[in-house]
A protein has these predicted regions:
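P-loop NTPase Walker
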Residues: 1-38
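Phosphate-binding glycine-rich loops and adjacent basic patches that engage nucleotide phosphates
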Residues: 2, 51-55, 154-161
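Conserved AAA+ ATPase small/helical "lid" subdomain
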Residues: 38-69, 73
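Conserved helicase NTPase catalytic core signature
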Residues: 64-257
């Protein structure tokens, strides 16, 4: 049985059509960049500090921490859903380092923050925070796992979101052609947009876990790739603030030899 275009995205049956101007816009390559910007709009940072508990102690996670985590994840060049783990890891690293500096700095050596904590202390804090529901909630709020229908639905029904994603790309008239009421059915010309959004989002990362016979080899490979991406990210960082630009990656040092 031959499938029509409206049946070619899993879980979506599109039968409605668009106006000719909307079809023309949706069929243009301009939509690739617009979808990219639409996805980036979901990658947010805290507007103000949020208090969580670290090792049983109240601790403030700052907007700067989430900003640096976002910069690291974006610079990895990974699809949005795969880059979420990098955002998570970097945010935990930021929290651990700041907390260690707060409670583990020798007053006689203030230029060496966290000196009083051992490597084991750092490892325990990192593991606890990676599994912390409060940290996971921050990750979900600022770098959620997304689906293609979410991206396209919000893009085409939220004027402000569409205007921001298409800034300098589409005219006001073009925006008007694309906008539709919330809960409108997907149209046949939406299917290529859904495909593009799915491509840019990528698959969600696998949960980190060990099998009965030991560590999951595939997960180890993915973690190693994530580590390389993080190192490369520091070399090609889309700097979120000036402090990020001071990072010297081990990748750079290795590459220089």
């Amino acid at each position: 049985v031959l499938m029509t275009l409206g049946d070619m995205f899993p879980g979506i049956t599109a039968r409605a059509d668009d106006s000719l101007p909307a079809q023309e816009i949706k069929g243009s390559l301009l939509m690739v960049d617009i979808i990219k910007q639409a996805i980036r709009a979901w990658q947010t940072v805290l507007a103000e500090p949020v208090t969580i508990r670290v090792d049983g102690t109240p601790f403030a996670v700052t907007p700067q921490m989430t900003r640096r985590a976002r910069g690291r994840a974006r610079a990895s060049r990974r699809p949005h859903n795969r880059a979420r783990q990098i955002f998570h890891d970097k945010l935990v690293e930021e929290i651990v380092n700041a907390y260690a500096a707060e409670i583990g700095t020798d007053p006689t050596q203030p230029d060496r923050p966290g000196l009083l904590l051992s490597a084991s202390d750092y490892a325990d804090l990192t593991e606890d925070l990676l599994n912390s529901p409060e940290v996971q909630a921050l990750v979900e709020d600022n770098w959620p796992i997304l689906t293609a229908p979410q991206i396209v639905e919000r893009l085409l029904t939220d004027r402000r979101h569409l205007e921001e994603a298409s800034h300098t790309i589409l005219s006001d008239d073009d925006v008007d052609y694309l906008l539709r009421a919330k809960d409108s059915p997907f149209t046949v010309p939406d299917v290529p947009l859904l495909d593009e959004a799915a491509e840019q989002l990528g698959r969600p990362p696998r949960p980190r876990k060990a099998t009965a016979g030991g560590e999951n080899w595939q997960q180890m490979v993915e973690d190693a790739q994530d580590a390389l991406d993080i190192l490369k990210a520091s070399a090609s960082m889309e700097f979120e603030d000036e402090s990020d630009s001071e990072i010297l990656a081990a990748y750079d040092i290795i590459d220089a030899h």
